[in-house]
From Swiss-Prot:
Its main location: cytoplasm. SUPFAM superfamilies: Class II aaRS and biotin synthetases, Nucleic acid-binding proteins. It comes from Salmonella typhi. It is found in: Cytoplasm. Homodimer. It comes from the Bacteria. One of its GO terms (molecular function) is ATP binding. GO terms for biological process: asparaginyl-tRNA aminoacylation. This is Asparagine--tRNA ligase. Keywords: Aminoacyl-tRNA synthetase, ATP-binding, Cytoplasm, Ligase, Nucleotide-binding, Protein biosynthesis. It is an enzyme of class 6 (ligase). Belongs to the class-II aminoacyl-tRNA synthetase family.
Length: 466
């Protein structure tokens, strides 16, 4: 007798007639007039529960089995047999059922109902992984993360752990969470009456990171190919389906790479991870296609088999101006493309994923390489049908004088970035990278509309529960 995951039973990795033990939670119990009960037991290892067939001859049948309800935890031992019923190949003929934990009051159990609104589930985020939806999201999230690590490992990249606490603003937007141990009731002041951060824990004003990119560049300029993958933070007061205050970012950086290399890497990476999730999470993707977004599987299959289009920002604006469509947000050269513009390009004009590149310098960050025209930078956004921007990246500015000039234009103090500037002083190289918002990737794969539902415990304005 061995303990096995439910997935091994349902996917035929356990021999028929072998005695096994599965451990999990009751999804449903059904009783027949013939004195047999059917328990659907899940353990999270796959989408479907396994059916345990329990005869009333078991010694605890009347006292315990007949009182099991949704959410109770059980340990079921029995023989794996071919299932005569529709919908599953194998089931367990139980010889022993142990109750590990009861649900105190089945009538008030928050997960008792079969269907819950997505808004309600956010209020019980500690219990929502027990639902079909959030359980499937969690498994897909895991598979995507593992596929990303696998892809970069196979490509010769090194994973670098960049700090979560920083004194630098990568984006230059100032939307950062301050980190401080100062006494809010008795703040130290300097001669100008401002808060004296010299007295703070780090001896300077410090923040939660908005990106690992700048730190990542330092390692790319020594190890050649690296990536970072971890949480990032934006103190942006946005209550939308696309924004979180805490989210995960994947950021590769490659030395001796230009913008074209960057675009090729992004395309290869996305196709790799989409192929992985289609192959490894077929049961979960089937659920998303049936219950969440009927195009979920077909969308990824199209993506994997379609070459990316490329277009310069200037040409993209011309396409939008000539298309005859009325947009909510006006289109003109110099505007940052909105989601509706991005989706028109990907879904209606190119009908494919598209890389928009060479944006006006005024709407992009200081570290992006200035093009020869002096007006645009070597930036790129990857736009995907169905969502719009999924990746943002650029070739980085490797020329110290140009970098300093861009910092001055944007009102940044170059002394705050002395270590970043050192990379341009000691053996500078062209290099490129991009950022992928992990939650937006998961939303795209699953068809789940709100990024709050693809991260275990969402952090949003006025919400840091659990």
């Amino acid at each position: 007798m061995s303990v096995v995951p439910v997935a091994d039973v349902l996917q035929g990795r356990v021999a028929v007639d072998q005695e096994v033990t599965v451990r999990g939670w009751v999804r449903t119990r059904r009783d027949s007039k013939a004195g047999i009960s059917f328990l659907a037991v899940y353990d999270g290892s796959c989408f479907d529960p396994v059916q345990a067939v329990i005869n009333n001859s078991l010694p605890n049948y009347n006292e315990e089995v007949l009182h099991l309800t949704t959410g109770c935890s059980v340990v079921v031992t029995g023989k794996v047999v071919a299932s005569p019923g529709q919908g599953q190949s194998f089931e367990i003929q139980a010889t022993k059922v142990e109750v590990a934990g009861w649900v105190e009051d089945p009538d008030t159990y928050p997960m008792a109902a079969k269907r819950h609104s997505i808004e309600y589930l956010r209020e019980v985020a500690h219990l929502r992984p027990r639902t079909n939806l959030i359980g499937a999201v969690a498994r897909v999230r895991h598979t995507l993360a593992q596929a990303l690590h696998r892809f970069f490992d196979e490509q010769g990249f090194f994973w670098v752990s960049t700090p979560l606490i920083t004194a630098s603003d990568t984006e230059g937007a100032g939307e950062m969470f301050r980190v401080s141990t100062l006494d809010l009731e008795n703040l130290p002041r300097n001669d100008q009456g401002r808060v004296d951060f010299d007295k703070d824990f780090f001896g300077k004003e410090s923040f939660l990171t908005v990106s690992g990119q700048l730190n990542g560049e330092t390692y790319a300029c020594a190890l050649s190919k690296i990536y970072t993958f971890g949480p990032t933070f934006r103190a942006e007061n946005s209550n939308t389906s696309r924004h979180l205050a805490e989210f995960w970012m994947l950021e590769p950086e490659v030395a001796f790479a230009d913008l074209e290399d960057n675009a090729r890497l992004a395309e290869a990476m996305l196709k790799y991870v989409f192929k992985a999730v289609l192959e490894e999470r077929a049961d979960d993707m089937k659920f998303f296609a049936e219950r969440v977004d009927k195009d979920a599987i077909a969308r990824l299959e199209r993506f994997v088999s379609t070459d990316f289009a490329q277009v310069d920002y200037t040409d993209a604006v011309a396409i939008l101006e000539r298309c005859g469509k009325t947009f909510e947000n006006p289109v003109f050269w110099g505007v940052d493309l909105s989601s509706e513009h991005e989706r028109y390009l990907a879904e209606e004009h190119f009908k494919a994923p598209v890389v928009v590149k060479n944006y006006p310098k005024e709407i992009k960050a200081f570290y992006m390489r200035l093009n020869e025209d002096g007006k645009t930078v070597a930036a790129m956004d990857v736009l995907a049908p169905g969502i719009g921007e999924i990746i943002g990246g650029s070739q980085r500015e490797e020329r110290l004088d140009v970098l300093d000039a861009r910092m001055a234009e944007m009102g940044l103090n170059k002394e705050d970035y002395w270590w970043y500037r050192d990379l341009r002083r000691y053996g500078t190289v062209p290099h490129s990278g991009f950022g992928l918002g992990f939650e937006r990737l998961i939303a795209y794969v699953t068809g789940v509309q709100n990024v709050r539902d693809v991260i275990p415990f969402p952090r949003t304005p006025r919400n840091a529960s659990f």
